[in-house]
Amino acid sequence: MDVNPTLLFLKVPAQNAISTTFPYTGDPPYSHGTGTGYTMDTVNRTHQYSEKGKWTTNTETGAPQLNPIDGPLPEDNEPSGYAQTDCVLEAMAFLEESHPGIFENSCLETMEIVQQTRVDKLTQGRQTYDWTLNRNQPAATALANTIEIFRSNGLTANESGRLIDFLKDVMESMDKEEMEITTHFQRKRRVRDNMTKKMVTQRTIGKKKQRLNKKSYLIRALTLNTMTKDAERGKLKRRAIATPGMQIRGFVYFVETLARSICEKLEQSGLPVGGNEKKAKLANVVRKMMTNSQDTELSFTITGDNTKWNENQNPRMFLAMITYITRNQPEWFRNVLSIAPIMFSNKMARLGKGYMFESKSMKLRTQIPAEMLANIDLKYFNESTRKKIEKIRPLLIDGTASLSPGMMMGMFNMLSTVLGVSILNLGQKRYTKTTYWWDGLQSSDDFALIVNAPNHEGIQAGVDRFYRTCKLVGINMSKKKSYINRTGTFEFTSFFYRYGFVANFSMELPSFGVSGINESADMSIGVTVIKNNMINNDLGPATAQMALQLFIKDYRYTYRCHRGDTQIQTRRSFELKKLWEQTRSKAGLLVSDGGPNLYNIRNLHIPEVCLKWELMDEDYQGRLCNPLNPFVSHKEIESVNNAVVMPAHGPAKSVEYDAVATTHSWIPKRNRSILNTSQRGILEDEQMYQKCCNLFEKFFPSSSYRRPVGISSMVEAMVSRARIDARIDFESGRIKKEEFAEIMKICSTIEELRRQK
């Protein structure tokens, strides 16, 4: 019998059917090869949007710079970056008028944070441009390298451990006539292998000292390295994203802290909150507009899209905003906050790896590094690349392109949101002074605009006014991509609103399944994801139960741990059957040891080990939770771990799951091949750094609220902490006199060794 699919939806409200429209199965596209072309696109496009600005030359670096601020007012609908300073300042003033004291209070909050933040804040984050090696590194390593080089160049403020003191060093470093850095290089030589008697290439890593003059150092300090954004769905073309170096990061962090504090106080801001909190905040704005429009007014909503938000923003505008926001604050605070936008006005974009050429006939491949693009003969390139290079050439210095206008992706999300909200704020009747008025939501470059008016003409006039007001501050609403509807149905940051936000459960589908970390973590993450979706995404009990059964099935196939009494034959079945037969209480076996599944939708919050603990045979308990088990390299496990799961759309999400350490919490060993490459030195540095940080955390666990303050080095801090703790333990009788004496002796020895060094 044929089933008419429409019948499935007879009882379902239309908005619940959104989960059936899910287009994203399979893997998202990843980029391969070089991002140089995408970066050149970004640089060229950004300059095109601001082409009527004024050209100047940076006196320190010699970089040509384009300044579109207060440029010509737009005469057409083309996107442009000609923001008018006075308009931006006026929008800020009105924002403050509608929210009395907002800037003042946010400044006070930020000032407190600035004085307390420690430099290790900069170790958060993933890949960071490491200016010492001129390539990307993990954030912690890049910071360590920067501090090491600052120290060897006589800059020592950072040793106090406060971020603000590190930033003082950054400022001083820019005044120095030269900086001496240590870089890594590879030597390759052909040697005969004693065992196989074949010729092999041996690589050795050298470190060499190099002096950078002021100009070269400044260029590196102002450089953003670029990469291609991966895993973007729904786009044919890839695009470039940027990662700044350590000199810029600290300043950006403080600006974003201030902007975050302002956004928290603005009802139209979709940042910095997320999830249900965000939905509640946004639903309030919609409710307000709908209540007011009940009988007399029409209300329409635009699901908005802005053209190239980042490329039309301008750091000089951000400087104007910060100058206004902090106008009554102490001089030092205003200076610290204005440095980030100033650095961005002088930024350089690194063009990435360059181009790869291959000759089919001679089987040769050669890399043309970005540094060579300035003077290589263009006949080797195809038409489109040739155009790009010709356009970008006047901007090139040492393989980086001068990029003064525009704001590379993801840098000032909070501050640009403040700018967007300030325009939404102008929609109040007391500002429009007419019959139409507007309000809306803003989250970075995404917006939704709600316009109310007595008739259609009024709605049209309101939209036009909003559009033009945006133009004045460098925001370009795309008329092609924005969509208007009766209020009650719109989309904002992938939330779909139809008389309330609709749970689009299918967006979470890719995060169901086995993560592939290890047996213990995967089980925990799997049930946590199902639990979270029951709480947040209208995942009903029947569907959740089914999801759970599918997950267990998936898990058993992944780890080949089918029940001990199953007929399925795998590599592990012989061992698991043996375990099953010799276990008295079979219900106590973990699923990964061939046990039954005891999970149902009521107990998803309990880790499996805890769920089954009372049911386990004693010797099984002993084997399972044995820290001395020689086959497991144990990482110390906090009570809660974080896993990264990928929803279909939007950024990777961090999911907290309960981590119970068992012999199933193994960590795969690092691939050996890295140890023979140039990365080896870096890997050792990183492990060293990790060990130090772990040791430090032992002395100052995150739970202890007081961080060491005003002590000059980590070692001294740890020694003094050890002495205090030992004294407390001795006086309360927790340790014996001999132990106390031994601890004191070790502390003195450490101090003595430091003095000799």
UniProtKB/Swiss-Prot annotation:
An annotated GO cellular component: host cell nucleus
InterPro entries xref list: RNA-dir_pol_NSvirus (IPR007099), RNA_pol_PB1_influenza (IPR001407)
Chain spans, region Disordered: 50-82
Region (Promoter-binding site) location: 249-256
UniProt cross-references to Pfam families, sorted A to Z: Flu_PB1
E.C. number(s) listed in UniProt: 2.7.7.48
Cell compartments where the protein resides: Host nucleus; Host cytoplasm
Assembly notes: Influenza RNA polymerase is composed of three subunits: PB1, PB2 and PA. Interacts (via N-terminus) with PA (via C-terminus). Interacts (via C-terminus) with PB2 (via N-terminus); this interaction is essential for transcription initiation.
Family stated for the protein in its record: Belongs to the influenza viruses polymerase PB1 family.
Function: RNA-dependent RNA polymerase which is responsible for replication and transcription of virus RNA segments. The transcription of viral mRNAs occurs by a unique mechanism called cap-snatching. 5' methylated caps of cellular mRNAs are cleaved after 10-13 nucleotides by PA. In turn, these short capped RNAs are used as primers by PB1 for transcription of viral mRNAs. During virus replication, PB1 initiates RNA synthesis and copy vRNA into complementary RNA (cRNA) which in turn serves as a template for the production of more vRNAs.
Protein name: RNA-directed RNA polymerase catalytic subunit
Source organism of the structure: Influenza A virus (strain A/Silky Chicken/Hong Kong/SF189/2001 H5N1 genotype A)
Lineage summary: Viruses, Riboviria, Orthornavirae, Negarnaviricota, Polyploviricotina
